[in-house]
Amino acid sequence: MDNLKKFFIDGKWVEPATSETMKVLNPSNDETIGIVALGSDEDVNNAVKVAKRAFETYSKTTKKDRLALLKELKFVTEKRFEDLAQAMRQEMGAPISMARSAQADAAIGHLDSFIDALNELEERTKLINGDILLKEPIGVCGLITPWNWPINQIALKVIPALATGCTCILKPSEHTPVSAMIYAEVIEEAGYPAGVFNLVNGVGDVVGTAMSKHKDIDMMSFTGSTRAGILVTKDSAETIKRVTLELGGKSPNIVFSDANLERDIEYSVKECMLNTGQSCDAPTRLLVESSCYEEVLKIAKKVAEEITIDDPEKEGDHI
């Protein structure tokens, strides 16, 4: 990855407006895997300007044209599959087997689903009363993604924007920028017009705030903490943007005494540990009927003790 200190704006890898940088660390060993540039208000302004300009033409493309681009995006994503998996192994410490089967594979699985959805989408529908329902692209979208499922979240935000004729600016988590920048290369190779997709790295207080407040961004999509989601909502309210949020929370499983305890507790504990316990829907709590509490405790302890921790570079089902 040669472009860690650059941003992808207007179809080109460009130098940032400022010289501020930060280290990207492998959390499994604290080794530095790269130095990434941090963006500023000026970088966001540059990205929004070209995204707004690109929207004028890209929003008028046909569904057939956008489907062809999505299919080419899938081809290039499959070609860069291992690069994406290895990037997430390093930047977030995901075991390589899981990085392939769950993390990188999400980029392809979600793409297949959105291709199917776009195929079925009727952009113009005549209602029973004679009215015409038109489905049109929203405009320029600001997309902010987290570090725990980097490509999964990028795919869930970027692909539907591209599929529906929107243009976008992506700010990935500053802790997992490498996979996002590889994905920018994928989009570039797939042949998307300049300015349709743009990437600016940076911290939320600077780049995220600039995006949420920008008058020419029509929609913000954010996945992350409740604290940051509140700020995105408040900042977006100044220009009455459409906002979608997926925020933090805890996800308890409820266990009653008539459940299959061996099966259900094993499933709960393993799901909690999946992705090293870093999934937003990890069942980190069990709400247990008192009559079976002691038995559940024994099963949970046994399953947890059997889970192994090892080097993410090694193949296997360890965490």
Residue ranges, per PLM feature:
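Generic non-transmembrane alpha-helical segments
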Residues: 72-83, 182, 186-192, 265, ...
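Residue-level signal for inorganic ion chemistry
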Residues: 30, 66, 88, 111, ...
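Short linear capping/connector segments at secondary-structure termini
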Residues: 87-95, 125-130, 248, 314-319
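Short, structured beta/alpha segment
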Residues: 1-90, 262
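Proline-centered turn/helix-capping motifs that create local helix->coil transitions or kinks
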Residues: 112, 116-125, 305-312
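Rossmann-like NAD(P) dinucleotide-binding subdomain of oxidoreductase/dehydrogenase enzymes
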Residues: 123-263
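Long amphipathic alpha-helix in the N-terminal Rossmann-like dinucleotide-binding domain
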Residues: 49, 71-82, 96-121
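ALDH superfamily catalytic-core signature
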Residues: 227-319
